[in-house]
């Protein structure tokens, strides 16, 4: 399993770009493309998982780190680890329910059996579950490099923290890592607002919820036209009707796996 590292504490726009590009390259199936957009692999790829190490720098100069574990075929975050008390502490989402997968998370995040300790996440990985614990919806949770940096500092190596603190960190990390890897539009929102905190707009939130639908539509398009119009949202929340691949292609970096052939170019 490969680890992609991102130094949040010394991040620049170009370093963030490079980070997302390497994540996309590690995640995608090298042989699958629709209309020039790379696609993620089917459900059982090798390697199956990806690790993303995020390093924060606190105002004291101290470096704190958190490693996220992602399912390669859909970029869902399964859990994370942090160094705690000279051990590797791992945290697994409640909805990772199969014993095999839980074991995988544990051994992939913390390979050394003699120095690992568990601190489970008591809720599911879905946005509604995370928003519930954070006490507000994603539209009210600010994103940004400084926020990600300080959120890591509130959790990494810290003995105890609330579900709220943890869920806020996860909402920020999932959107700035997984969602930005899937969507160029979300990557560009982070870059446009790089040195300030920002609230995700309606288009960001809508893309996050329609990735599967968008992937299916692009995969099924004939000569660049969708079989039926795709109803999405603009940044201001107004209706955005998409009829052709070209109209949404600039916003999409990776397609979710869809079986069967598609037009490659």
UniProtKB/Swiss-Prot annotation:
Expressed in which tissues: Seeds.
Keywords of this entry: Disulfide bond, Glycoprotein, Hydrolase, Plant defense, Protein synthesis inhibitor, Toxin
Catalytic activity: Endohydrolysis of the N-glycosidic bond at one specific adenosine on the 28S rRNA
SUPFAM superfamilies: Ribosome inactivating proteins (RIP) (SSF56371)
GO biological process: defense response; negative regulation of translation
The protein's enzyme class: hydrolase
Glycosylation sites: 120
Coiled coil: none
Function (record text): Inhibits protein synthesis in animal cells. Useful as immunotoxin for pharmacological applications.
Family: Belongs to the ribosome-inactivating protein family. Type 1 RIP subfamily.
Name of this protein: Protein synthesis inhibitor PD-S2
Organism: Phytolacca dioica (Bella sombra tree)
């Amino acid at each position: 399993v490969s680890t992609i590292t991102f130094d949040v504490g010394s991040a620049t726009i170009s370093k963030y770009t490079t980070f997302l590009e390497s994540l996309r390259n590690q995640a995608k199936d090298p042989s699958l493309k629709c209309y020039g957009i790379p696609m993620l692999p089917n459900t059982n790829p090798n390697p199956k998982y990806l690790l993303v190490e995020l390093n924060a720098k606190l105002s004291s100069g101290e470096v704190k780190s958190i490693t996220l574990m992602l399912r390669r075929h859909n970029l869902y975050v399964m859990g994370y680890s942090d160094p705690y008390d000279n051990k590797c502490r791992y945290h697994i989402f409640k909805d990772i329910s199969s014993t095999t997968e839980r074991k995988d998370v544990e051994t992939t995040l913390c390979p050394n059996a003699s120095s690992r300790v568990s601190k489970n996440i008591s809720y599911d990985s879905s946005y509604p579950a995370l928003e519930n614990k954070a006490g507000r919806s994603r539209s009210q949770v600010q994103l940004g490099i400084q926020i990600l940096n300080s959120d890591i500092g509130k959790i990494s190596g810290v003995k105890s923290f609330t579900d709220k603190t943890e869920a806020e960190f996860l909402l920020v990390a999932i959107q700035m890592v997984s969602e930005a890897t899937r969507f160029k539009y979300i990557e560009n929102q982070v870059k446009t607002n790089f040195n300030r905190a920002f609230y995700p707009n309606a288009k960001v939130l809508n893309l996050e919820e329609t990735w599967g639908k968008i992937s299916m539509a692009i995969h099924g398009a004939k000569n660049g036209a969708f079989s039926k119009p795709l109803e999405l949202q603009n940044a201001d929340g107004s209706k955005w009707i998409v009829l052709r691949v070209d109209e949404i292609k600039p916003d999409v970096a990776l397609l979710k796996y869809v079986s069967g052939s598609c037009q490659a170019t």
